[in-house]
């Protein structure tokens, strides 16, 4: 799950979560811009969206449904392309009533401690 739908560092605590975590918004932007990584992420989000009538919990199980929400939130914020932003927001709308992951937003927009 971590390398298919990465999330922001600070959300997961396992070794795998730390290994595959995205450090910041700039790294998320580079991830999206990479033809392989960004392409695979988009393809996989489209595949999940294709499961109409099911919840993220039905499709992914727990806690991966929460990780998916975190991933969508991160990349909706990172997307500079309107079609990318629409894709991630469409998935947030379909599975989470349009509500992004609060903790991801807090971590993204918090000021670094000095």
Predicted regions and their residues:
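Short helix-capping/linker segments at secondary-structure and domain boundaries
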Residues: 10-16, 77-87
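C-terminal end-helix/capping segment
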Residues: 21-40, 102, 109
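Hydrophobic/aromatic-rich, well-ordered segments within soluble, folded domains that form packed cores
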Residues: 1-25
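Phenylalanine-focused residue identity feature
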Residues: 3-5, 68, 75, 88, ...
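Charged phosphate-binding loop/patch that engages nucleotide di/tri-phosphates or the phosphate backbone
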Residues: 80-114
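Mid-chain, well-packed structural core segment of small domains
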Residues: 30-80
């Amino acid at each position: 799950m971590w390398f298919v739908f990465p999330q922001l560092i600070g959300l997961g605590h396992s070794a795998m979560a730390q290994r595959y975590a995205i450090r910041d918004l700039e790294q998320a932007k580079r991830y999206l811009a990479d033809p392989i990584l960004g392409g695979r992420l988009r393809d996989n989000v489209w595949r999940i969206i294709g499961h109409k009538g099911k919840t993220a919990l039905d499709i992914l199980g727990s806690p991966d449904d929460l990780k998916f929400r975190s991933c969508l939130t991160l990349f909706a914020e990172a997307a500079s392309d309107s079609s990318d932003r629409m894709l991630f927001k469409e998935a947030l709308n379909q599975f989470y009533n349009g509500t992004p992951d609060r903790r991801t937003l807090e971590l993204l927009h918090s000021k670094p401690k000095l």
